[in-house]
UniProtKB/Swiss-Prot annotation:
Annotated localization: Cell inner membrane
Location, primary (coarse class): membrane
Catalytic reaction list: K(+)(in) + H(+)(in) = K(+)(out) + H(+)(out)
Protein name stated in the entry: Probable potassium transport system protein Kup 1
Annotated HAMAP family: Kup
Pfam families membership: K_trans (PF02705), K_trans_C (PF22776)
Keywords tagged on the record: Cell inner membrane, Cell membrane, Ion transport, Membrane, Potassium, Potassium transport, Symport, Transmembrane, Transmembrane helix, Transport
Encoding gene, per UniProt annotation: kup1
Transmembrane annotation, as ranges: 6-26, 44-64, 90-110, 129-149, 158-178, 193-213, 237-257, 280-300, 328-348, 354-374, 385-405, 410-430
Organism in which the protein naturally occurs: Bradyrhizobium sp. (strain BTAi1 / ATCC BAA-1182)
Length: 611
């Protein structure tokens, strides 16, 4: 696909969040600053512009997007790039999990604050509708989440053109605002922002939390890199998004300096002539829906990564498009996000109230990304210590400023994403640690495969092929031992199959399968998938034809273990965690269904394991 279509696609998916931030950023910053006077407005504009330049243009577009994992981005991809397979990288795993958990909290807030802020633009032209804005927002959000299962293949093609129209409109509105008061462009000088910060004490510090709202969508540039590539995202940012954002924020500042707010408290809508107010609200509502859609799709994509990396229980993943692999639907994630988003909408009831909750999650994720980037600079890019400390250190200082300012608003709403993130992090760590402990327990009394094959001798064989799913190919799978113990027979051909998730998003077809004959008609097979791919075992077996191994599915039986978890009295796990892991394990999607194995060819052999 050419550069232009990819740029249009990126504008419809990547830039929805950061592109709709002008709806509430300047308004919130002025309110937190305690006034809408000219000096304050110029200070806010300077801080907003330089936040966009430092955090988005320099940190993400110029530096972080270079840290791709085989083309894929996002904090989990970065975590995988740094090698989570090594036991000593527990700190890297923890940072990746915390960052991902925080983004789920942010994912619940973004749709609520975006849709509310757009519909609040109706208050001036249609004041009689004000009491119904929360209800209308809830209806729109319910409709958005309800449609997820149908996919966005068709309507998604309109997202890019709509967002192009959005950026052009807000850029033109901003330009007309600047023409009324061109002197606001002096605020592009960073000294205006620094002067405000250092001359207003605690207020200057706290207002950074509101200023940060302009950059909350910056993480999406990195997270969605795998869908469009770094080059189209960079071109779209510098060619359209950044200029239009700066124009609009400058135009809003001009309205404030010109004392032209009137009855409209939001400088964004004050930019617009009264006759065009309703069309602007309609366009803003559509843009916020697109931004919300991007957040929801991102949550689905991140969940699939977590499942493939073994950080989350298997969940049912539905493909909603025959052509777009990234278009998936995960019901559990969708309905959980909807419940959280509706709770926020009905509980906080306005974008002003939600602003205090917004920002803390993303700022913490950005801080963790900066720390992981330091490791990337040292270990992957082989930068010297001085260059790594200077670059990552600058990012950490900026991120810490925003995190500290946002933490001051924890009691006013910032607690919500932190609580959501803490719960999700605890669940993911419980699953990760529980799986490791379970695997060790299962492998404790295993028999070496070579020894078993040497002892097989003249065991009774029955026609057909038996495929045993296993995590190790050097030992005998427990289901095979159970089958031999109870049925006293072996199949003519036995395949030990291990499915491995690579630390890359995708695996090349010629590297997907390894097959080895180990004697007595035993074969070991490794099938590799990237953490962005959906495993399909029957398809992998069909690809073995070119390696001389032919499978007839009607003559092939798949043996899998079904384990019942029981908590030990003196477990390494806390009793509560052990019971929680048991519940998660019991309710996880069956391995056979996840790997797309025909259910009529599956034989489950159970056992009990204490952890």
């Amino acid at each position: 696909m050419g550069l232009r279509p990819l740029m249009v696609g990126a504008l419809g998916v990547v830039y929805g969040d950061i592109g709709t931030s002008p709806l509430y950023t300047m308004k919130t910053a002025l309110e937190w600053a305690g006034g809408a006077d000219a000096e304050t407005a110029l200070g806010m504009l300077s801080l907003i512009v330089w936040t966009l330049l430092i955090t988005t243009s320099i940190k993400y577009v110029a530096v972080v997007m270079r840290a791709d994992n085989d083309g894929e981005g996002g904090i989990l991809a970065l975590m995988s790039l740094l090698g989570i397979k090594h036991g000593e990288r527990l700190g890297v795993i923890a940072m990746g999990l915390i960052g991902a958990a925080l983004l789920y909290g942010d994912g619940a807030i973004t749709p609520a604050i975006s849709v509310l802020s757009a519909l609040e633009g109706l208050k001036s032209p249609l004041p009689q509708i004000s009491p119904y804005i929360v209800t209308l927002s809830a209806i729109i959000l319910v409709g958005l989440f309800a449609l997820q299962a149908q996919g966005t293949d068709r309507i998604g093609k309109l997202f890019g053109p709509v967002m192009i129209a959005w950026f052009i409109v807000i850029g033109i509105l901003g330009l007309f605002g600047i023409l009324r008061h061109p002197s606001v462009l002096a605020a592009l000088d960073p000294r205006h922002g620094l002067s405000y910060l250092f001359s207003h004490g605690m207020t200057g510090f706290l207002v950074l939390g509101a200023v940060f709202l302009c950059a909350t969508g910056a993480e999406a540039l990195y997270a969605d890199m795998g869908h469009f590539g770094a080059r189209p995202i960079r071109f779209a940012w510098y060619g359209l998004v950044l200029p239009c954002l700066i124009l609009n924020y400058a135009g809003q500042t001009a309205v404030v300096v010109d004392a032209a707010l009137g009855q409209e408290p939001n400088p964004f809508f004050a930019l617009c002539p009264a006759a065009l107010q309703l069309p602007l609200v309609a366009l803003a509502t559509v843009a916020t829906i697109i931004a919300s859609q991007a957040i929801i799709s991102g949550a689905f994509s991140m969940t699939r990564q977590a499942i493939q990396l073994g950080l989350c229980p298997r969940l049912n993943i539905a493909q909603t498009s025959a052509t777009g692999y990234g278009q998936i639907y995960i019901g559990f994630v969708n309905w959980t996000l909807m419940a959280l988003t509706l709770g926020l909408t009905l509980g906080f009831r306005s974008s002003d109230n939600l602003a205090a909750a917004f920002g803390i999650a993303v700022s913490l994720t950005m801080l963790l990304t900066s720390i992981l980037m330091f490791l990337t600079m040292r270990e992957i890019w082989k930068w010297n210590l001085a260059a790594s400390l200077l670059t990552a250190g600058l990012f950490v200082v900026v991120d810490m400023s925003f995190v500290s300012a946002n933490l001051m608003k924890v009691l006013e709403g910032g607690w919500f994403p932190l609580v959501v993130a803490a719960v999700i992090f605890f669940l993911m760590m419980t699953w990760h640690q529980g799986r490791d402990l379970l695997v060790k327990k299962l492998e404790r009394d295993t028999l070496p495969l070579a020894t078993f094959i040497a002892q097989v001798g003249a065991k009774t064989r029955v026609p057909g092929t038996a495929v045993y799913m296993t995590s190790r190919l050097d030992v005998v799978p427990v289901p095979l031992l159970h089958n031999l113990k109870h049925n006293k027979v072996l199949h003519d051909r036995i395949v030990l199959l291990r499915v491995v998730t690579a630390s890359t998003p995708r695996v090349a077809p010629d590297l997907r399968i390894d097959v080895e004959h180990v004697g007595s008609n035993f074969h070991t097979m490794t099938v590799r998938y990237g953490f962005m791919e959906q495993p399909d075992v029957p398809e992998a077996l069909d690809q073995c034809r070119q390696r001389g191994l032919i499978f007839n599915m009607m003559e092939t039986s798949f043996f899998v273990g079904r384990v019942k978890i029981v908590a030990e009295r003196r477990s390494r796990f806390a009793a509560f965690q052990a019971h929680l892991f048991e519940i998660m394990h019991r309710n996880a999607m069956a391995a056979t269904e996840f790997f797309r194995i025909p259910p009529n060819r599956v034989i489950e052999l159970g056992g009990q394991v204490e952890i």
